[in-house]
A protein has these predicted regions:
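C-terminal cap of metal-dependent C-N hydrolases
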Residues: 6-11, 336, 348-383
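Divalent metal-coordination and catalytic microenvironments
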Residues: 7, 22, 27, 48, ...
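Histidine-rich, glycine-flanked metal-binding segment
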Residues: 9-54
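Metal-associated gating/positioning segment near the N- to mid-region
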Residues: 49-115
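Active-site gating loops and adjacent loop-to-helix segments of metal-dependent hydrolytic enzymes
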Residues: 66-93, 131-134, 145-157, 208, ...
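His/Asp/Glu-enriched, well-ordered alpha-helical/loop segment
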Residues: 67-68, 72-80, 84-85, 213, ...
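Active-site core of metal-dependent hydrolases
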Residues: 89, 186-281, 296, 336-338, ...
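Metal-coordinating catalytic core of metallo-dependent amide/deamination hydrolases
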Residues: 126-229, 233, 302
């Protein structure tokens, strides 16, 4: 048992901020309260420091594009074909990439990482803790989601190869075809004579059954609407990834969210490096929040280094978003966006003992994370 004493606690659930203690036991949060006692527990006096849930990045590519490497550590896009649902992030992640340690030291304790957006269907994402160790040591869930992409990226990659897709029409058609072929495959597999095993089609069956959400990369408003259209056609669970121009079509986003879609915004701390980013703005979080839309913030690491997730939230506050919503966008709403809110994202009894402790408010860019705990264990300590 570990008892953290006399903290300013930002629990992201319940009645709100409080001054008090956090008791951790067997990797979980056991209790929050004032002047807690626990015979036999290790006690840490942390008066004046801030405690918040370990942060959650709902979309990144950590370990897939390794820091400081080029092709040697570039394992995020398999560009031999545009439909590759059978690919698994866990087979490409380098768990010893130093960026995991840097994220952990910044208070980011969980991340969702996977293939990039070169392919119409790119493969399977995984959720990891940022603790030291192998993929198996870090693993929360795999697969967590299936990656799909609309817009410029698949067009650019395959036009250069003089193959399909070269237009948005072809991108949407390839996505539909893959889903339709997987449906037909499932039907034939269920029949008496069966069907020959197909690894790619097999990988799409959990998506069609609603067991695995589709993470759909879409920046431009029309691509976002295409993502919604196709997901609704096939009755899929899905999330809108990046959603850069989502603030231009709030009614469509809200209707999709009311039907179960998740929204993950970002990366915002970047240049407008392509045409579909021309309406990129840090005002987007506030504009969506004002329309009643819940969202998470992402770094899209390595686009924005994972350790700067709280900086992204702070800059959204500078542009008018309230602090509570900004913090939730990198904690509870991040966990909710990827279906892990039962374990992550808030300081509540029964949830994983993932805690980030700061000297100063976490959204003050001058503040430093002085301690990080994952599953109740201290994995970073700079007090």
């Amino acid at each position: 048992m570990l008892l953290l004493k006399h903290l300013h606690i930002l629990p992201m659930a319940g009645p709100g901020p409080m001054n008090g203690d956090i008791l951790l036991e067997n990797g979980k949060i056991r209790a929050l309260g004032r002047e807690l006692s626990a015979p036999g527990a290790q006690v840490l006096e942390l008066e004046g420091l801030y405690a918040m849930p370990g942060m959650v990045d709902a979309h990144c590519h950590i370990g897939m594009w390794e820091d400081g490497n080029m092709i040697e550590g570039d394992d995020g896009n398999e560009t031999s074909g545009p439909i590759t649902p059978e690919l698994r992030a866990i087979d490409a992640i380098n768990p010893f990439d130093r960026c995991f340690a840097e994220a952990c030291a910044a208070g980011v304790t969980a991340c969702v990482t996977g293939p990039g957006s070169a392919n119409v269907i790119g493969g399977q994402f995984a959720a990891l803790k940022t603790r030291p160790g192998s993929v198996e040591d870090k693993l929360i869930q795999a697969p967590l989601a299936m990656k799909a992409a609309l817009g410029e990226n698949p067009k650019r990659v395959y036009a250069a190869q003089k193959s399909s897709p070269q237009t948005r029409m072809a991108t949407a058609a390839l996505l539909r075809r893959a889903l339709l072929e997987a449906q037909a495959y499932a039907k034939k597999r269920a029949e008496k004579e069966g069907a020959d095993f197909d690894m790619a089609k097999e990988a799409l069956l959990p998506v069609l059954r609603g067991e695995l959400p589709l993470k759909i990369h879409a920046h431009r408003a029309d691509d976002i609407l295409t993502a919604i259209r196709i997901a609704e056609e096939f009755h899929l669970r899905f999330s809108l990834e990046h959603c850069t121009e989502g603030y231009l079509i709030p009614e469509a986003i809200r209707q999709a969210q009311d039907a179960g879609a998740k929204v993950i915004i970002g990366p915002l701390l970047m240049d407008r490096s392509k045409v579909e980013l021309r309406n990129l703005t840090f005002q987007a979080p506030k504009l969506l929040h004002d329309q009643g839309i819940e969202f998470a913030l992402m770094t899209d690491h390595p686009v924005v280094p994972l350790q700067y997730l709280p900086v992204c939230a702070a800059l959204a506050v500078r542009e008018g978003l309230d602090e509570d919503t900004a913090l939730k966008a990198i904690t509870l709403h991040g966990a909710r966006a990827v279906g892990l809110e039962d374990r992550l994202g808030s300081l509540e009894p029964g949830k994983d003992g993932d805690v980030a402790i700061f000297r100063g408010h976490p959204l003050d860019v001058r503040s430093r994370c002085v301690m990080t705990l994952i599953d109740g264990q201290i994995v970073h300590d700079q007090r």
